[in-house]
Amino acid sequence: MFLMVTGFMNYSQQTVRAARYIGQSFMITLSHANRLPVTIQYPYEKLITSERFRGRIHFEFDKCIACEVCVRVCPIDLPVVDWKLETNIRKKRLLNYSIDFGICIFCGNCIEYCPTNCLSMTEEYELSAYDRHELNYNQIALGRLPMSVIDDYTIRTIQIK
């Protein structure tokens, strides 16, 4: 008889505990009902990125002195800098500069340590391509400034607070 009573007590305690857990979960669900949806309809709506966002790298060919600091500070030795030594003026002349965004980890070390500030991060994050070789940007592709999301009238921008 005593075992039956203790078994019934355990069963009732477990039932009350389960009802409490279900009630707590339901209260959390109801608290989320008042919030606005966080889903963004991507091609038609885009987020305005913060000013510290690490997007595609922008390169200014005229400012670069081919010092290769960006290559030395890159954790994966990614930027490819081709230069030629001009013997008459004893300076390096930049021939080619390229970055493969299929490999880049967007750490920002190259931008931070560049002595001439010829590298900067843009707000562009749409770098998808059908072929991974299209992600290898030379100095001409790196020099193009992206179109601002705010200026595009076909897209509704959303500010996250």
From Swiss-Prot:
**Molecular function via GO:** 4 iron, 4 sulfur cluster binding; iron ion binding; NADH dehydrogenase (ubiquinone) activity; quinone binding
Q: Name one GO biological process term.
A: photosynthesis, light reaction
Cofactor(s) required, per the database record:
[4Fe-4S] cluster
**Amino-acid positions noted as binding [4Fe-4S] cluster 2 in the UniProt annotation, renumbered to this chain:** C74, C104, C107, C110
| 4Fe-4S ferredoxin-type domain segment(s) | 55-84, 95-124
Q: Which Gene3D superfamilies match?
A: 3.30.70.3270
Q: How does it sit in the membrane?
A: Peripheral membrane protein
| Top-rank taxon | Eukaryota
- Residues bound to [4Fe-4S] cluster 1 are C64, C67, C70, C114
| Family of the protein in this entry | Belongs to the complex I 23 kDa subunit family.
NCBIfam families registered for this protein in UniProt: ndhI (TIGR00403), NuoI (TIGR01971), PRK05888.1-3 (NF004537)
Role played:
NDH shuttles electrons from NAD(P)H:plastoquinone, via FMN and iron-sulfur (Fe-S) centers, to quinones in the photosynthetic chain and possibly in a chloroplast respiratory chain. The immediate electron acceptor for the enzyme in this species is believed to be plastoquinone. Couples the redox reaction to proton translocation, and thus conserves the redox energy in a proton gradient.
Q: What is this protein called?
A: NAD(P)H-quinone oxidoreductase subunit I, chloroplastic
Q: Which organism is it from?
A: Lotus japonicus
